[in-house]
Regions:
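N-terminal pre-domain/capping segments
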Residues: 1-119, 213, 276-286
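Active-site acidic/histidine proton-transfer and metal-coordination neighborhood
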Residues: 7, 17, 54, 95-189, ...
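Hydrophobic faces of well-ordered beta-strands that scaffold small-molecule active sites
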Residues: 23-28, 55-57, 83-88, 121-123, ...
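Acidic-and-aromatic substrate-binding clefts and catalytic sites of carbohydrate-active enzymes
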Residues: 32-38, 58-69, 90-104, 128-132, ...
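Alpha-helical scaffolding segments of alpha/beta enzyme cores, especially the outer helices
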Residues: 42-46, 70-78, 104-115, 135, ...
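Acidic/histidine-rich catalytic cores of soluble enzymes
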Residues: 54-55, 151-238
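Substrate-binding clefts and catalytic carboxylate motifs of secreted carbohydrate-active enzymes
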Residues: 225, 246, 264-268, 276-277, ...
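H/E-rich (His + Asp/Glu) clusters that bind or coordinate divalent metals
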Residues: 237-244, 251-259
Length: 286
């Protein structure tokens, strides 16, 4: 699935002054989901050894990869990693009692996020049954405002992570417009997935300008030059990230996450290629 993102790059407040003093490149752990399922501690050590400094979590269900918040935080510390963000679901699917979602157990999710040092929580994906009409999106927007208020009290910023379906007309309207216009900008910002934005035929930089300062997080993943527009390693595809990175200040971006939902071989090999391109080519454009 595409609802988790990868690799995080931290930009401190110096970005507002045009400089970047602290560079920590991170990774969205969904990219290495099979490795995390088998050996989370070992996988995190390998990630750190590649030069990553941050990770973005996924799959929280009351625990982080089977660990309570305190244990997971200890593992991160041992590996020299921090987790500034994590992915969560809305929760209006199945039996509608899905722990760690906006609609069920949100307060605990926020408390656990704070306990491990997260400063962002991102709504990763809307299930098809959650988004059948514009009325659904209006209800989601209202619920995101409430969830964002809970986050704010804990010193955490709520974000919404897009795919391409939010840009497809529904009931004569564009769902992304509803999510943007009917949420409080102070309570709900965006984690813009630049792959899905591009696949939807939108220009990321135009969105940065339209929602200036509100796109706090990016998902950086590349698209190959085939009719299917598949995922590929960053720097191996057709998305002009050198151009995009030059507009980080307009976006308001604080972290970016390199992601590859599907890899041709070992995911660890793919993220190794991606971080090399980020280090050699993209950072200088910030």
């Amino acid at each position: 699935m595409a609802w988790v993102a990868a690799g995080s790059f931290f930009i401190n407040d110096a970005l507002a002054l045009g400089g970047v003093k602290d560079k920590k490149i991170g990774v969205q752990l969904y990219t290495v989901r099979d490795d995390m399922a088998k050996d989370p501690r070992g996988t995190l050590k390998k990630i750190a050894a590649m030069g990553f400094g941050e990770v973005e979590n996924f799959g929280y269900n009351g625990k982080f990869f089977g660990m309570e918040a305190s244990e997971y935080k200890q593992v991160l510390d041992e590996c020299g990693l921090v987790a500034p963000s994590g992915h969560y679901l809305y929760g209006n699917f199945g039996n509608k009692q899905n722990p760690g979602t906006v609609l069920f157990g949100w307060e605990k999710a926020v408390a656990d996020a704070k306990a491990i040092g997260q400063t962002y929580m991102a709504i990763a994906f809307l299930m098809p049954e959650e988004r059948t009409s514009i009325a659904d999106y209006k209800k989601i927007a209202a619920d995101l405002n409430k969830a964002g208020a809970v986050c704010k009290k804990a010193g955490i910023q709520l974000c919404y992570h897009n795919h391409d379906f939010e840009f497809q007309e529904l009931d004569g309207q564009i769902p992304f417009d509803i999510l943007a216009n009917e949420t409080d900008p102070a309570l709900v910002k965006f984690e813009l997935d630049l792959f899905w934005v591009s696949k939807a035929g939108k220009d990321p930089i135009a969105l940065f300008k339209q929602y200036k300062g509100r796109v706090a997080l990016w998902h950086v993943k590349d698209m190959d030059n085939t009719p299917n527009k598949n995922f590929t390693e960053v720097g191996s595809g057709v998305i002009d990230y050198a151009r995009i990175f030059k507009h980080a200040k307009t976006s308001g971006m604080k972290h970016f996450f390199v992601e590859q939902d599907v890899c041709p071989g070992a995911p660890l090999d793919s993220i190794r290629k991606s971080i090399a391109h980020v280090q050699s080519t993209l950072l200088k454009n910030l």
